[in-house]
Amino acid sequence: DAPRVCAMEYIYFARPDSVIEDVNVHKFRKETGRILATGDDVQADVVIGVPDSSLSAAIGYSEASGLPFETGLVKNRYVGRTFIQPTQEMRDRGVRMKLSPVKEAVEGKSVIMIDDSIVRGTTSRRIVRLLREAGAREIHVRIASPVLKLPCFYGVDISTKEELIGHRMTVEEIREYLEADSLRFMTPEQLRFAAGTAGLCTACFDGSYCTDLYSYSEVLS
């Protein structure tokens, strides 16, 4: 089989100026935002992205929907990426230190909040609460990737399905947990469409693992 690139490289890990398998990451992320906006009939005032990896998708959503893009969250540049912190306590503390809402951008408004992915759900819930505290009237969460529901055996730090909120809950249950007004994800097919000619490993979304799993298959049972 042809080699496949980890989808999370495009979604989360790589810089927007990166080019992987002839596909620019910024262009890919903008396309995911455009796809999310297609057919989305929610009534909203502004589009914001969770910095930094979601900003390109938020711009794409804004362009496709005609809704204005706003800087609704500001990032502390001296705090590392929360997803790759080793413990949940460190991830939670990282969110509190890392992001601040821009009250003037969201107060009294219906907000489309674009995020790149939901892994465990705790980070997204804290961000929704930050926006509520800043006065957002409604928060509609749009995820620029499919529901992440299966572990990765190739290097990404999601080794068990039990830690993944997408494995334990339905989309509606995740929405309730996040305390969001609505929630939508992409499909694996839409993600592959956004990637164009680049072959993606989407195993964590749909179980299409690139190799035989041997003893690791017990983790999925």
Model-predicted segments: where are they?
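PRPP-associated nucleotide enzymes
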Residues: 1-221
